[in-house]
Regions:
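Basic, Lys/Arg- and aromatic-enriched nucleic-acid-binding interface segment
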Residues: 1-9, 20-79, 129, 178
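C-terminal flanking helix
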Residues: 12-15, 19, 204-208
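Catalytic-site neighborhood detector that most strongly recognizes the C-terminal catalytic loop/helix
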Residues: 36, 43, 104-108, 141, ...
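C-terminal catalytic core of Y-nucleophile DNA break-rejoin enzymes
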Residues: 38, 104-124, 130-150
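Short basic/aromatic active-site micro-motif
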Residues: 65, 139-141, 158-178
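C-terminal catalytic core of tyrosine-transesterase DNA break-rejoin enzymes
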Residues: 70, 74, 80, 150, ...
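Short, polar N-cap/turn motifs at the start of nucleic acid-interacting alpha helices
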Residues: 89-96, 158-159, 179-199, 206, ...
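C-terminal secondary-structure termini that scaffold catalytic or DNA-interacting sites
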Residues: 138, 215-224
Length: 224
């Protein structure tokens, strides 16, 4: 797995430091060939995302989590970054509209995201709700995951809803599929390398190829 590869790479680095300092004579991982599997990037289709957005929730508890999940789908923010948002993270961007300006807690990479109408509506809905400077009502992560399972069942979605999936949905369904340049998507996601973002572009292209193959099958009777 990728986790094992990363662990072995750390051991290899430690041994190299030991060799450089004369504490060891050989690195047992020197000839190890590293192989990373491409991570599966699940995401919601526009139909699924619309279902989540429009489905009436049976409780305020689930409504809050649904709104925060949708917010992440339209901003690309990870759970911890959305949870940390305060008023000072809202700035006026170069287009004279509200933007989010923050840093990814995972990598410290800067993130600038122009706010679309949907996340702006969600922020307006919860303005002053928390009683402090936080912008959104977000409970502990484990509770969020439990609530998201309930929401998926209510919406008839078989995919496992997580904030990772929301972030992937932003990258694919919300931005790349709608023609946002990959360089812009990479910057909004806080990726340090365009190579990381290209995984999403491949997903979009694979989906496009599948859709066109299905369309070709349906249109076979029109062949000249």
């Amino acid at each position: 797995t990728n986790y094992m590869m990363k662990t072995i790479l750390k051991y290899k680095s430690v041994y190299q430091v030991a060799i450089d300092n004369g504490w060891a004579q050989r690195n047992p991982f020197a000839n190890f060939k590293f192989h990373y599997e491409q991570a599966e990037r699940g995401y919601l289709t526009m139909d699924e995302l619309t279902r989540v957005m429009q489905k009436a929730m049976p409780s305020k508890r689930l409504e809050h989590i649904r709104d925060v999940f949708v917010f992440s789908c339209f901003t690309g923010l990870a759970y911890c970054d959305a949870q940390a948002l305060t008023r000072e993270h809202i700035i006026t961007g170069s287009n004279n509209r509200p933007w989010l300006r923050t840093h990814r807690q995972k990598t410290s990479a800067p993130v600038d995201v122009p706010l679309l109408d949907v996340p702006l509506q969600i922020l307006a809905k919860y303005e002053g709700y928390s009683g402090n400077d936080r912008l959104l009502p977000i409970p502990a992560n484990q509770k969020c995951n439990d609530y998201l399972k309930e929401i998926a069942a209510i919406c008839g979605i078989e995919k496992r809803l997580t904030f990772h999936l929301a972030r992937h949905t932003f990258a694919t369904t919300v931005t790349l599929t709608n023609g946002v340049p990959i360089e812009s998507v990479s910057k909004m996601l806080g990726h340090r390398s365009l190579k990381t973002t290209q995984i999403y572009a491949k997903i979009v292209n694979d989906k496009l190829a599948e859709d066109m193959t299905n369309l070709s099958t349906r249109l076979q009777h029109l062949a000249m």
